[in-house]
Amino acid sequence: MEFGLKKRARHEVKVEVASLETKYPHNVMLYHYPPTEDVHIDEFEELALERLRLLRVLDRASTRNLRVLSDEWKEIVSADLTREGLRSYLRLCSTGGSAKHEADIQTRRRDYLSHFILRLAYCRSEDLARWFVAREMELFRYKFAALSSFEVKQFLEANGFEIHPLTEAQKDEVKDGLYESTVGQSVAKIELLDFYKVPFTQVLDLVRGRRCFLKAGYAYVNTHDLVSLVGTKQQDEIEQGLQAAKTMVEDVEADERISRTLKALHNSYTGRDYTVCRDAAVPIESLDQLSKTSMPLCMRMCHEHIRANHHIKHSGRMQYGLFLKGIGVALEDSLRFWREEFTKKMDADKFTRSYEYNIYHNYGKKGSMVNYTPYSCAKIIKDVAGPGDCHGCPYKNMDQGSLKTKLSSYGLSASAIDEVMFFVSRGHYQIGCGKYFQLTHNSPVEPSINHPNNYFEESQIAMGNRQKRANGSAPPKARIRPDIKGHGDRSMLMGDDDDELWRIAETQERIMQSQKDISEAFNDDLDLTQIDY
């Protein structure tokens, strides 16, 4: 791929459909040949984030211990894709493989390009590569399962598979074995299925699961299970492609913007931007009650720490203060909340000198005028709390005994605590948080939690205090971290973009006024945000 780096106005990329239909004729492709078209840096980043959102949907489904392609798995993935604004990919995974609609053809292009972009990000370590291959194979199986028998034949022919369905006479010779080995299908349906005769060594997973008929060293595989054979080739293609991508990384990353995008991609936040709350305003008088009903554990514990100690360290102030801004606490109310608590242990002048300016700064009203975004789960999980701290993710940072005690004090039964701890003990902290939400809200559905403000919003919706947003609305456009050295718009940046921005902000603040309590730098967390070139 070639990446055009000249500045251009942002607009929807729309490539000539006729040429695309020739390049991408099928929903299911083996990603054998790298794309050759030019891709602008803006679209490069947008495609990378879009596919990351797609793979994360599959990752969340995989942590629920559901069988891939089971009805429950499909239901969860379908709902999550819709919620993430990825309905075009949902259509790609659930409709005919060679549809000629323009939207489908454009989605195939995005699918193909984004796969190769992510190879450049996930070839860097065995762990990243393993995660990428697993998710891509789930996506491949999902798409392949939607193909009809005729479309499967088209796919096999287009990709050089020298296998053909059995003739009726050939099927009749082994029909008894086919009836016995094909689980979950009636005799009438089995007679309508296509079967393929392949060396048993090519479908060892089917052999192990006794899901095919074996005779004389050959396996007889029906259309639905043929994904086992073609999936092996797909996985080989991806694994070899990752090895090839390693040799390209140095050349591709000669451009700093691409390098920054690829290195930060896996840990980037891809959800909604909570910089400004567009729903109801939240008065500080309601925070005590809201902490019990609508705040996730990480924020509830911060709130209780402040109420008990009338102070909280810098990292905790950032985590909780930005959360309050995101749920709808106005600047004036935020100042009043922090002042009322902190002045219980210090005089008002000290609070004004040491803390007030930082609050203005977080709301983008002083200094560098950066309107920071509340921390995502990815950012919070990475933060480790030291002695006397209360920030970070309690599901990760607390020992299991203390966490169980805390959950019990919040009213969870022993069996409910065990449900939460099942996921926490396996490192699935966000799913544990979602289970906590489900149990405390008596919700029939366990939500996917990727942001504390997302948790709060879902809680308010469940309690009837806010209306649910239109289903399937697309999230904000994929955005990239700003080039701080340039002159682009820096009025709205992610709170995770810490070290470099904070140093610039401090320099400006020293010039504007003498403030000494804003010198603590954030931890480096290269999230992808807004950029103009």
Swiss-Prot record:
GO terms for cellular component: alpha DNA polymerase:primase complex. GO terms for biological process: compound eye morphogenesis; DNA replication; DNA replication initiation; DNA replication, synthesis of primer; DNA-templated DNA replication; mitotic cell cycle. Binds 1 [4Fe-4S] cluster. Signal peptide: none annotated. Pfam families: DNA_primase_lrg. Disulfide bonds: none annotated. Coiled coil: none annotated. One of its GO terms (molecular function) is metal ion binding. Disruption phenotype: Mutants exhibit eye defects and a delay in the S- phase of the cell cycle. Residues 480-490 have a biased composition (Basic and acidic residues). Its cofactor is [4Fe-4S] cluster. Expressed in embryos (at protein level). Residues 466-492 are annotated as: Disordered. Heterodimer of a catalytic subunit Prim1 and a regulatory subunit Prim2, also known as the DNA primase complex. Component of the alpha DNA polymerase complex (also known as the alpha DNA polymerase-primase complex) consisting of four subunits: the catalytic subunit PolA1, the regulatory subunit PolA2, and the primase complex subunits Prim1 and Prim2 respectively. PolA1 associates with the DNA primase complex before association with PolA2. Belongs to the eukaryotic-type primase large subunit family. Regulatory subunit of the DNA primase complex and component of the DNA polymerase alpha complex (also known as the alpha DNA polymerase-primase complex) which play an essential role in the initiation of DNA synthesis. During the S phase of the cell cycle, the DNA polymerase alpha complex (composed of a catalytic subunit PolA1, an accessory subunit PolA2 and two primase subunits, the catalytic subunit Prim1 and the regulatory subunit Prim2) is recruited to DNA at the replicative forks. This is DNA primase large subunit. The gene is Prim2.
